[in-house]
Amino acid sequence: MSAEASGSSGGHAVTVSGSSPSSSSHVGEEKPGRSLVSSKYVKLNVGGTLHYTTVQTLSKEDSLLRSICDGSTEVSIDSEGWVVLDRCGRHFSLVLNFLRDGTVPLPDSTRELEEVLKEAQYYRLQGLVQHCLSTLQKRRDVCRGCHIPMITSAKEEQRMIATCRKPVVKLQNNRGNNKYSYTSNSDDNLLKNIELFDKLGLRFNGRVLFIKDVLGDEICCWSFYGEGRKIAEVCCTSIVYATEKKQTKVEFPEARIFEETLNILIYENGRGSGGMALLESGGVSSSGAGQSEEEGAGAGGGDRRVRRIHVRRHIMHDERGHGQQTVYKD
């Protein structure tokens, strides 16, 4: 039971005006109440929870509770003098504390905060309504932060891509799979790929789901998904013979990655069916520095095609011509 401290015990709780002692024997009987201004204390039965407070507290703000006290809103008062309000009493203590202090700590749970907002709107407490709305907005702003999931298993990845309604960009980055030393620029290019992934994640936050895979087979590989299927792939690693030894080379095909990221936006908001035909017709794809190949089922199998772009293919030492340092094999 909620109670408000008072200076004198001489105050009296509101009762039905004109009721005789004999009428109080009818338990549960309700009668329309009159103005409560003449009373100092009010007993409230809010959805089964009992609260004891003063008319002064209820009248602090221009609200439904004030109109109940001054008689402009008719209420029911039972035979024991309780003002009956047909509302959930779970958050009514919070409502009373707001009236007493002008502010009140709000629940951490968003669901409970929305419940308090509903009660504040019902009682027409504009101060509490604004307090709830501003707190909800702040929490939503925090929740809008950029979150990039880290893949922990192949099943998790498949489920995430299949159920996501947004386009998906995945960066596979597993340096543990490297068997050879890196070329001189590979470390820098690897960091550039990671930095670009972070920048794109911030730039397209809310429109594209960016996920990172550190358990896959590739050292550095971008994959692009739309409507639950892979649309394109950009592999940034290759094996080269630079000093009579195999070395791992990591490239940074920035323009190609940007292009594929923009292409994948065609699948945003369920617009994939039209975008699919456009992508497969080559209308939005331009030739890059690397080699591009498509996997599919030929005619009639266009829906299964995946554009795989390899910036550099494998380079064989025994295929280098005289005086040449590098030979590319397609």
From Swiss-Prot:
<keyword id="KW-0539">Nucleus</keyword>
<dbReference type="GO" id="GO:0043161">
    <property type="term" value="P:proteasome-mediated ubiquitin-dependent protein catabolic process"/>
</dbReference>
<dbReference type="GO" id="GO:0021952">
    <property type="term" value="P:central nervous system projection neuron axonogenesis"/>
</dbReference>
<dbReference type="InterPro" id="IPR000210">
    <property type="entry name" value="BTB/POZ_dom"/>
</dbReference>
<feature type="compositionally biased region" description="Low complexity">
    <location>
        <begin position="282"/>
        <end position="291"/>
    </location>
</feature>
<dbReference type="GO" id="GO:0051260">
    <property type="term" value="P:protein homooligomerization"/>
</dbReference>
<comment type="function">
    <text>Substrate-specific adapter of a BCR (BTB-CUL3-RBX1) E3 ubiquitin-protein ligase complex required for synaptic transmission. The BCR(KCTD13) E3 ubiquitin ligase complex mediates the ubiquitination of RHOA, leading to its degradation by the proteasome, thereby regulating the actin cytoskeleton and promoting synaptic transmission.</text>
</comment>
<dbReference type="GO" id="GO:0005634">
    <property type="term" value="C:nucleus"/>
</dbReference>
<feature type="domain" description="BTB">
    <location>
        <begin position="40"/>
        <end position="108"/>
    </location>
</feature>
<dbReference type="InterPro" id="IPR045068">
    <property type="entry name" value="BACURD1-3"/>
</dbReference>
<dbReference type="GO" id="GO:0035024">
    <property type="term" value="P:negative regulation of Rho protein signal transduction"/>
</dbReference>
<dbReference type="GO" id="GO:0043065">
    <property type="term" value="P:positive regulation of apoptotic process"/>
</dbReference>
<comment type="similarity">
    <text>Belongs to the BACURD family.</text>
</comment>
<dbReference type="Pfam" id="PF02214">
    <property type="entry name" value="BTB_2"/>
</dbReference>
<dbReference type="InterPro" id="IPR003131">
    <property type="entry name" value="T1-type_BTB"/>
</dbReference>
<dbReference type="GO" id="GO:0061351">
    <property type="term" value="P:neural precursor cell proliferation"/>
</dbReference>
<feature type="region of interest" description="Disordered">
    <location>
        <begin position="1"/>
        <end position="34"/>
    </location>
</feature>
<dbReference type="GO" id="GO:0007420">
    <property type="term" value="P:brain development"/>
</dbReference>
<keyword id="KW-0833">Ubl conjugation pathway</keyword>
<feature type="region of interest" description="Disordered">
    <location>
        <begin position="282"/>
        <end position="304"/>
    </location>
</feature>
<dbReference type="GO" id="GO:0016567">
    <property type="term" value="P:protein ubiquitination"/>
</dbReference>
<dbReference type="GO" id="GO:0060322">
    <property type="term" value="P:head development"/>
</dbReference>
<dbReference type="GO" id="GO:0031463">
    <property type="term" value="C:Cul3-RING ubiquitin ligase complex"/>
</dbReference>
<protein>
    <recommendedName>
        <fullName>BTB/POZ domain-containing adapter for CUL3-mediated RhoA degradation protein 1</fullName>
    </recommendedName>
</protein>
<dbReference type="InterPro" id="IPR011333">
    <property type="entry name" value="SKP1/BTB/POZ_sf"/>
</dbReference>
